[in-house]
């Protein structure tokens, strides 16, 4: 079973939290708010996205790299995660 399926409820809860934070940010932008409050909300969204990414990466590394017995498959999976990290960190 895929780690994203096994952890689906936890990951969906994180995604829902992010969605709520984005909705709150959009409301903040429609009304006058202090810049600091807007920046804090953006930082909170970024932190939540980073947390979601961390959980999915941890699951991927554990299931597809650490516990992968097929060396070719492990190398392929590692390459995939490295490409994703490159695009995420840009």
UniProtKB/Swiss-Prot annotation:
Instruction: Enumerate the UniProt keywords alphabetically.
Output: Cytoplasm, DNA-binding, Repressor, Transcription, Transcription regulation
Q: Which GO terms describe its cellular component?
A: cytoplasm
Keyword presence, Cytoplasm: yes
Which GO terms fall under biological process for this protein?
Answer: negative regulation of DNA-templated transcription
The domain of life is: Bacteria
Show the InterPro entries listed in the entry.
Metal_Tscrpt_repr, Metal_Tscrpt_repr_sf
One Pfam family recorded for the sequence: Trns_repr_metal
The keyword Nucleotide-binding appears for this protein: no
**In the record, what terms sit under GO molecular function?**
DNA binding; metal ion binding
**Major site of localization recorded for this protein:** cytoplasm
- Enumerate the subcellular locations listed in this protein's record, separating them with semicolons: Cytoplasm
Q: Which family does it belong to?
A: Belongs to the FrmR/RcnR family.
What's this protein's function? Repressor of rcnA expression. Acts by binding specifically to the rcnA promoter in the absence of nickel and cobalt. In the presence of one of these metals, it has a weaker affinity for rcnA promoter.
> Sorted alphabetically, which PANTHER family does this protein's record hold?
TRANSCRIPTIONAL REPRESSOR FRMR-RELATED, TRANSCRIPTIONAL REPRESSOR RCNR
Q: What is this protein called?
A: Transcriptional repressor RcnR
Q: Which gene encodes it?
A: rcnR
């Amino acid at each position: 079973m895929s780690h994203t399926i096994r952890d689906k409820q936890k990951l969906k809860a994180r995604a829902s939290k992010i969605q709520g934070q984005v909705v709150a940010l959009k409301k903040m932008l429609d009304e006058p708010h202090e810049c600091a409050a807007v920046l804090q909300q953006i930082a909170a969204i970024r932190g939540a996205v980073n947390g979601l990414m961390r959980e999915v990466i941890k699951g991927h590394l554990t299931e597809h790299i650490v516990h992968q017995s097929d060396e070719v498959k492990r190398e392929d999976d590692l390459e995939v995660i490295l490409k994703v990290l490159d695009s995420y960190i840009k």
